[in-house]
UniProtKB/Swiss-Prot annotation:
The gene is murA. Phosphoenolpyruvate binds at K34, N35. It comes from the Bacteria. It catalyses: phosphoenolpyruvate + UDP-N-acetyl-alpha-D-glucosamine = UDP-N-acetyl-3-O-(1-carboxyvinyl)-alpha-D-glucosamine + phosphate. Pathway: Cell wall biogenesis; peptidoglycan biosynthesis. Belongs to the EPSP synthase family. MurA subfamily. Keywords: Cell cycle, Cell division, Cell shape, Cell wall biogenesis/degradation, Cytoplasm, Peptidoglycan synthesis, Pyruvate, Transferase. This is UDP-N-acetylglucosamine 1-carboxyvinyltransferase.
Amino acid sequence: MMAVAEASQESLKQRLNVSGGNGLKGTLRVSGAKNSALVLMTASLLSEETIELTNIPSLTDIDGMSAILESLGVQVDRQSDCIRLTAAELSGSAPPYELVNSLRASFFSIGPLLGRLGHAQVPLPGGCRIGARPVVEHIRGLKALGAVVNVEHGIVTASVPGSKKRLTGAQIVLDCPSVGATETILMAAVLADGVSTIENAAQEPEVQDLANLLNSMGGQVSGAGGPLITVQGVERLRGCSNYPVIPDRIEAGTFLMAAAITRSPLVVEPVIPEHLSAVIQKLRDCGCSIQIKGRAVTITPGEITAVDITTQPFPGFPTDLQAPFMALMCTAKGTSVISEKIYENRLQHVAELQRMGASIRLEGSTAIVEGVAQLSAAPVTGTDLRAAAAMVLAGLSAKGITEVAGLKHLDRGYDDLEAKLSAAGAEVKRNIP
């Protein structure tokens, strides 16, 4: 627990010095998906047997989730990109606030704890400060499955009434296709009595990855990846070995945009192309040639021209790539309109890009971006995870050396970003005071 806090404090003091004007070359390797790995780790709470996950990225968020699971009695064994989780005997159902506060994904523990133990007490989550990300849908779904849920003083307490301590299958219709709510309900329903359906379910690849893991553990989940998911509850789930986390589509998209903003031909792999269809289409629209061969994506940028994007749930353009794409559009020919429809406070990077000479006008949750000939280096701060990535990308194309602060955010979601970029020809150096 202390080690996680110390790592976060250390990264607060660090800066990333990014020298602009260097092209990229070769291949950038994509790590396992952060947003999938965190949820799959919490699924270990559903079984008494060992869950072995591979292709786990090296991130502070993974360290934080490991600490949360250990606080609940899970044995965690991490070796390189493999993690073994054994929840044979859980010692508690209430993860501590000091761990949960910095990691939004910690709230995913409520579904497995409730499904297996019949009770859970989880503080409301933390993570990036990019606007309201309520858990109303999560709670409504748990109540539909028969849980009694109370929220008081920032803590969500949930329990299953009766002697069986077992949830009951139900028909659940989400008001919006929330990824977190879909995954929470899915993990709670897998051990419930009877059949559950989730209508208007999130269709993101990370939901599919969770369903695939649960099925490999003996669950009966069908329809994941579509708007209707059906879950036939089972008595128990077994362990599983060597389950690979899907490649991180957001990291892959960031790398493709790094190639585009530096006007560099590059290979990005491994990528599941259908996970990035909307992004690949927009990159093609703005002047990039993209070739796909298996899980390798080769991008060859031409003249970059402005295109418009609107963030949407999958399979639309992902909100997590809005900031990096805006950095690219700052260097494009023409005017682009970027509309953020998922989170109301996810345009904080605009002010930082303006410090680098970007021409951006805000109208509510929409940014109008006039491309400029070249950005100029400046000291900037990544105000959240994806904003930090956008600052790095802007620095790669800017004149001079850009100093990027806010690395605690970057380290939450990008596995050794500076080393990967440096290996591809960028001049990126972490300044440790």
